[in-house]
Amino acid sequence: MSNPITITESAQSHFAKLLAQQPEGTNIRVFVVNPGTQNAECGVSYCPPEAVEATDTEYPFSGFSAYVDELSLPFLEEAVIDFVTDKMGSQLTLKAPNAKMRKVSDDASLMERVEYALQTQVNPQLAGHGGHVRLISISDDGVALVQFGGGCNGCSMVDVTLKEGIEKELLAQFAGELTAVRDSTEHDRGEHSYY
C-alpha cells in the first residue's frame, strides 16, 4: 500500500531525535481535526504503544512509524511534513492539501472537481482575508457560478480576484470544460469587508 504522507529526511531525523527522549515504543500520530470542513487542521503528536487503535494504519519511516486514524486517512492524501531551518530558526511544517476536502477521483463530475479546486487551491488564499468562495452551479455551456462569503463579500477587489485569479486558474485547469466564471454574490459593503 502506498504511503499518502511524505515525511522529508530532515523531518524524519527531527522526529527520531524527539522520539529518542520518549519511552521506548513511542511513535508519532498524524491526524486531521474537523476533516472535510473549512476548519480542518492537521497535527502531529506522540503515539505511545497503548494509544494505537486496531483501525489505525501504520506507515514505517526511518527509525519510527507514523500512525493515522481511519477518519483522517483520506484527508492526508498528498500531505508533506518537512523540517525547515532558516534565519529565523527551525520549524516543522505540515502541508495537507486535502484536509478540508477529500481528494476527488479523475472521473468525478465537473461540479465535484471544480468544487475541490476551489476548496483546496482558491480558498486557502482567500482565508488570509477572512474570505471564501463556493461553487453554486455550472451551466450547460460551461459557465461556473460562484458565491463569495466572509471578508470577500463587499470587498472592492473581488472583481480583480475573480477575473485575474480564480477565473484564470480554473479556465486553465478545466480547459475545454469551463468557459467562464461568474460571481453570484450581492456585494453590499459592510463591516465585514476586507477592503
Curated annotation (Swiss-Prot):
UniProt keyword Signal present: no
UniProt cofactor(s): [4Fe-4S] cluster
Keywords of this entry: 4Fe-4S, Iron, Iron-sulfur, Metal-binding
Top-level taxon in the UniProt lineage: Bacteria
Binding residues annotated for [4Fe-4S] cluster, in chain numbering: C152, C155
SUPFAM superfamilies associated with the record: Fe-S cluster assembly (FSCA) domain-like (SSF117916), HesB-like domain (SSF89360)
One Pfam family, short name: Fe-S_biosyn
Statement: the UniProt record of this protein carries the keyword Metal-binding: yes
Free-text remark on how the cofactor is bound: Binds 1 [4Fe-4S] cluster per subunit. The cluster is presumably bound at the interface of two monomers.
Single GO term (MF): iron ion binding
Swiss-Prot/TrEMBL GO biological process terms: iron-sulfur cluster assembly; protein maturation
Subunit structure: Homodimer.
Protein family: Belongs to the NfuA family.
UniProt xrefs under HAMAP family: Fe_S_biogen_NfuA
Protein function: Involved in iron-sulfur cluster biogenesis. Binds a 4Fe-4S cluster, can transfer this cluster to apoproteins, and thereby intervenes in the maturation of Fe/S proteins. Could also act as a scaffold/chaperone for damaged Fe/S proteins.
Protein known as: Fe/S biogenesis protein NfuA
Gene name of the encoded protein: nfuA
